[in-house]
Amino acid sequence: MMDFDERVPVGSNMYLPSCTYYVSAGADFSGLPSFSTRPMTYSYSSNLPQVQPVREVTFRDYAAIDASGKWPHRGNLPQCYTSAEDMVHRDCLSAQTAVVGDMFGKNSPAAAAAAYHHHHHHHTSASSAATNFYGNVGRNGVLPQAFDQFYDTAYGNASESSSTNGFSGDKTPTKQPSSAPEDAQACRDTEAKEPREESSSPELSSDGQRTRKKRCPYSKYQIRELEREFFFSVYINKEKRMQLSRMLNLTDRQVKIWFQNRRMKEKKLNRDRLQYYTSNPLL
C-alpha cells in the first residue's frame, strides 16, 4: 500500500493522523461543505448494478400487484368439487365401507364383493347418495341393507346358541325375583317331599346326569331377621329355631342350615382378620 504522503499533497489545513492538529480559535468552517453531503466515489461502484433497498422492493413488487392480471379468478369451481354435503357423505361412506370390508372381507368373499359394489355405486351416483343412504338403512340401524344378511346370520346364531346353551334349571342354580312367601312355600313343599336323611350332594338321575335341587334364596327380610338373631346368639336352640321358622315362613331345617353356614362364614372372616393384622405390625 502506498504511503499517504506520496498520494496526497500535504496542505496547511490537512489533518494527518500522525501529527498533532491544532485548530485556531478564529478559524471559520462555514464555507466548507458538510461531510455527509460531499459526494464520494468508489472504484468498484461501476462494476455492480444499482441495488435498491429491500423495503422499497418489497413494497413495490407486492403492494401494487394486479390480482386480476397475475392470478386468474377461479370462481366456484363446480366442475372440480361437489357440494359440501356430498363430500362429507362420500368420505364417511368410503371410510365406513373400508371398515366393513376389513371386518367381513377376511372370512367371506361375498361380503367383500357386496362392500365393493356398494362403495362403487355410491361414488358413481354422488348426487342421489345423500338421500338414498339415510333412507336405505338396514335392520341394524347402522349399515345399509346390503349387510342385512350378515346381521340376520349373526343374530340368528346368537339366538340359537343361547337356546341350545341355556341351562335346564337343574344344572345351574337360578335366582328369580319373587316374593318371600312364594319362595318359602316352594321350599317348604320341596322339604316335605324329601326324606330328612337326604344328603346335600348331587344325585344321579335316571338318565345318568347329575341333578341338583332347586335353590331357595332367602329374601332380604329373612336375611335381616336371621342376622339379627345370629348377632345375639351364634348357636340357636330348638325353641328359637322353630319360632324363627314360623315367623319367616321357613322350615326348621332351613334355619338350622343357615346358622351352620353363617358360623363357618364368621370363622373364615375372623381368620382373615387375624391374618391381616398379624401381617401388618403397624396396625
From Swiss-Prot:
Question: What CDD domains does this protein map onto?
Answer: homeodomain (cd00086)
Q: What keywords are assigned to this protein?
A: Developmental protein, DNA-binding, Homeobox, Nucleus, Transcription, Transcription regulation
Q: Which gene encodes it?
A: hoxa11a
Localization in the cell: Nucleus
Q: Does the keyword Ribosomal protein apply?
A: no
* Span list, region Disordered: 160-214
Residue range(s) of DNA binding per entry:
211-270
Q: In which residue ranges is the amino acid composition biased (Basic and acidic residues)? A: 185-199
**How is this protein annotated for GO cellular component?**
nucleoplasm
Q: By its UniProt entry, which PANTHER family does this protein fall under?
A: HOMEOBOX PROTEIN HOX-A11, HOMEOBOX PROTEIN HOX-A11-RELATED
| Residue stretches in coiled coil | none
Function recorded in the entry: Sequence-specific transcription factor which is part of a developmental regulatory system that provides cells with specific positional identities on the anterior-posterior axis.
Output the InterPro entries linked to this UniProt entry.
DUF3528 (IPR021918), HD (IPR001356), HD_metazoa (IPR020479), Homeobox_CS (IPR017970), Homeodomain-like_sf (IPR009057)
Q: Name one GO molecular function term.
A: DNA-binding transcription factor activity, RNA polymerase II-specific
Tell me one Pfam family matched here. Answer: DUF3528
- Tell me the protein family, please: Belongs to the Abd-B homeobox family.
Kindly list the residue ranges recorded as spanning the membrane: none
Tell me what this protein is called: Homeobox protein Hox-A11a
Q: What is its main location?
A: nucleus
